[in-house]
Every structure is written in structure tokens, then in C-alpha cells.
Design a protein with these regions (language model features):
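A short, well-ordered alpha-helix in the C-terminal region of glycosyltransferases
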Residues: 311-326
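Conserved acidic donor-binding segment of nucleotide-sugar-dependent glycosyltransferases
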Residues: 285, 289-296, 305-310
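Conserved donor-binding/catalytic core segment of Leloir-type glycosyltransferases
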Residues: 4-5, 163, 173-191, 197-203, ...
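Donor nucleotide-sugar binding/catalytic pocket of nucleotide-sugar-dependent glycosyltransferases
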Residues: 132-169
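Aromatic "clamp/platform" in nucleotide-sugar-dependent glycosyltransferases that forms part
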Residues: 253
């Protein structure tokens, strides 16, 4: 089967880029995949979309559309699979890709909490247009599922992010005391960094390790000595540092289905995460503590709840089991393959 995948590749690293690499590995020998790379370029690659300059963005859009149209005109594509963050500029590009799809079978994959992204009349209209045109829409969580259902009658599937089975730890050695808590991701206000800093003022016996590119807005905040900023690290470096921690803290204000949180679960770490996106569905009530967004007090209380070694050991064991049973890459990839074949059945039968 020939698949045209419209999706970012690293650099820079990110949730969708990691997903794309994983998909290409799993597709090897199964699908013939043609990839159109939608990754940020220039300053946007360095600042993860914070700075948008018109000319570089026009150049990027032209390059993406040029590659997309060339593949469509030179290859007999069976399925177009578009990965999207549903951002303001991204949804416009996605709509253009859909408009030029030439009646090809289409899977639109939303890597976000859709209702948090499609704000405003134009974005909503573009989203509805794409949903109606797609053969199937993939979403990450229940809220996004309901949102698409409210706009379109298109088939909707909840497809979780996945992790390579060889990256799932066989076991995790739980320390006697809770001394090191790690956060991995963009270090900015909307990721709950201010709340981490405030919680650290109360939990002085714990070190908070913050790994990821640091926004200017955070650099101006005075933080206590037990908060350590590491800046941007490679994926391998970040994962190595994560595995040395006693717990993973993820107080983001909004989320789809966090790859880094999935990686923390696969490492066997107990989780403290906000009730946004798929976070609560992932750890349920046994893999960690779910807290309200923008509450340093709840972070402090959650930390106290997981201090006992026995509690953290049970959470670790449960998270490893959950990842193995629900998020292995081979199982998730099989679901995607099944959808491809379902939407292409009429064509295959006519052949």
C-alpha cells in the first residue's frame, strides 16, 4: 500500500516528530511511505513556533505544498495520512492539502486537544471542512472525539500515541526516598513551570530537574536553589536523565496525548499530571496523581501522597503494565493499518 504521510520529522524534536520516526520504522516492509516533512525551519525550529516571520513561513508553505503535489502527481497513492497540531497556520496548510487531495482516501490525525486549538470562526470552518472530507479522523482523547462528532459525521477513532516495545523497561528500581523529580518538555508558563517553581519553595528537600528549551518568560523568574534548569537536550540525553529520577511531574495547562509522559510511564516512573488531554486516561487512578491545572498547592499535596516507597512501587508496576498492554507500537500500528485497509476496501474489491 502506498501512503503519503504529511508530518514533521526531527529536527526539531517533538511529539509529532517522534511519532513520525516511530511510524516509519513500523511501516518498513509493510507500506511504501512517501513523506512530506512539515517541520519548522529557521527561527521557528529554534523557538518551537514562538516567532512567526512572514517570508520564511511562505517559503516553508511553498516547499511543503510543492513536495506534496509532486508526490501526488508522480505516485499512485492509496492513502494520504495528515498529522496535524491544528494550529492557526497549520490548519490552513492542512485544508490546502485536503483541497488538492484529488479524491484520494484521507486520514486526518489530530495530535492535540482539538477544542483548545480550533478557536475562532475561520479555524472552526477549516476544521469542519477537513473532517467532512476525511475518510477517518484520528484523535487522542475523549474530549477531541466528542468535538469532531459535534462537527461531522465522519468516522472517528481514538488512536493513542505509541512507544517502541524495546523502550519499555522490564522493571524500575524504586528508591527509598523521594529526592528527585523530573520534568521534560518546553520550559514555559503554559507547561506549568511557574507552579513547579512555587511548589519547589515548599518542598525544599527535593530537587526539581527541568529539561528542555527555556522560554524568555521563565528566565526572568527567580527560582529556588532546588530547581535545576538544563536547557535543550537530545532525546537520548533527556531519557537517560529521566530514568534517574524518582517521579515525573507534568503540570501542563493543555495537552493532547503526551509522548514524554508515555515515555516516563514506560520508564516506570510514578506520575503527577494535570487533568488535561489524555493525562488522566493514561495513568487512571493507579499510575500516579491527577491534579488541577495552575495549582502549586495540588502539586505539593501530590508529592506528599507519593512520598511512601510502597506507593511509588505500586504506581511504577502499574504504569509498566499499562504501557505494555495498551501503548506498544506494534499494537497501535496494527490499528492504523486496519483503518487503511477498511477505507480502501471498495477500491481493492473493484480491482
Amino acid at each position: 500500500m502506498k501512503v503519503l504521510l504529511v508530518s514533521p520529522l526531527p529536527p526539531p524534536n517533538g511529539g509529532m516528530a517522534t511519532w513520525t520516526e516511530q511510524y516509519l520504522r513500523d511501516s518498513d516492509g509493510v507500506n511504501n511511505v512517501y513523506t512530506v516533512n512539515t517541520a519548522f525551519i529557521g527561527e521557528r525550529a529554534l523557538h518551537k513556533g514562538r516567532k512567526i516571520k512572514i517570508l520564511p513561513e511562505i517559503k516553508r508553505m511553498a516547499s511543503i505544498m510543492g513536495s506534496y503535489l509532486k508526490i501526488l502527481h508522480t505516485q499512485s497513492i492509496d492513502v494520504i495520512h495528515i498529522n496535524s497540531s491544528c494550529s492557526k497556520t497549520g490548519i490552513l496548510r492542512d485544508a490546502l492539502c485536503v483541497a488538492f487531495a484529488n479524491k484520494k482516501h484521507l486520514v486526518f490525525h489530530c495530535h492535540c486537544n482539538i477544542q483548545d486549538q480550533l478557536k475562532g470562526r475561520l479555524a472552526t470552518k477549516l476544521g469542519k471542512y477537513i473532517f467532512n472530507r476525511a475518510d477517518c479522523v484520528f484523535v487522542l482523547n475523549k474530549a477531541s472525539f466528542a468535538y469532531v462528532r459535534g462537527l461531522s459525521r465522519t468516522q472517528v477513532r481514538m488512536i493513542p500515541n505509541a512507544i517502541a516495545h524495546d523502550l519499555i523497561a522490564s522493571k524500575y528500581s524504586v528508591s527509598d526516598e523521594l529526592r528527585n523529580i523530573v520534568y521534560v518538555g518546553h520550559v514555559k508558563i503554559k507547561k506549568g513551570i511557574c507552579e513547579i517553581i512555587e511548589a519547589a519553595r515548599s518542598e525544599k528537600d527535593i530537587k526539581f530537574h527541568l529539561i528542555g528549551p527555556i522560554a524568555d518568560e521563565i528566565k526572568q523568574i527567580h527560582s529556588p536553589e532546588n530547581v535545576v534548569f538544563y536547557g535543550r537536550k537530545t532525546h537520548e540525553e533527556a531519557m537517560k536523565m529521566m530514568k534517574m529520577a524518582d517521579a515525573f511531574l507534568f503540570p501542563s495547562y493543555t495537552e493532547g496525548f503526551s509522548m514524554v509522559m508515555l515515555e516516563a510511564m514506560a520508564a516506570g516512573l510514578p506520575i503527577i499530571a494535570t487533568d488535561v488531554g489524555s493525562n488522566a486516561d493514561m495513568i487512571e487512578i493507579k499510575g500516579g496523581v491527577v491534579i488541577k491545572p495552575q495549582s502549586s498547592n495540588e502539586i505539593v499535596q501530590a508529592i506528599e501522597n507519593i512520598r511512601p516507597q510502597k506507593v511509588r512501587a505500586e504506581m511504577s508496576k502499574w504504569n509498566l503494565h499499562k504501557v505494555k498492554s495498551s501503548y506498544r507500537d506494534d499494537a497501535v500500528f496494527k490499528q492504523i493499518q486496519e483503518v487503511y485497509h477498511e477505507i480502501c476496501v471498495p477500491d481493492l474489491e473493484s480491482d
